[in-house]
């Protein structure tokens, strides 16, 4: 059976934490920022975690399953 290929888009977008959770960046922070408030832009800067319902799909894309 051939090796699984890692999804190249996913490996650029997700990172693993030490405890095994998956980090992600927030969307809506690249352009059209003039109509967003300072607070919105500041909160979008922080990293988030992948939701529990999506973890299995992301792990499959990263060939961790």
Curated annotation (Swiss-Prot):
GO terms for cellular component: cytosolic large ribosomal subunit. GO terms for biological process: translation. Keywords: Ribonucleoprotein, Ribosomal protein. One of its GO terms (molecular function) is structural constituent of ribosome. The keyword Oxidoreductase does not apply. Pfam families: Ribosomal_L35p. PANTHER family: 54S RIBOSOMAL PROTEIN BL35M (PTHR33343), LARGE RIBOSOMAL SUBUNIT PROTEIN BL35M (PTHR33343:SF1). Belongs to the bacterial ribosomal protein bL35 family. This is Large ribosomal subunit protein bL35. It comes from Parabacteroides distasonis (strain ATCC 8503 / DSM 20701 / CIP 104284 / JCM 5825 / NCTC 11152). The lineage of its organism: Bacteria, Pseudomonadati, Bacteroidota, Bacteroidia, Bacteroidales.
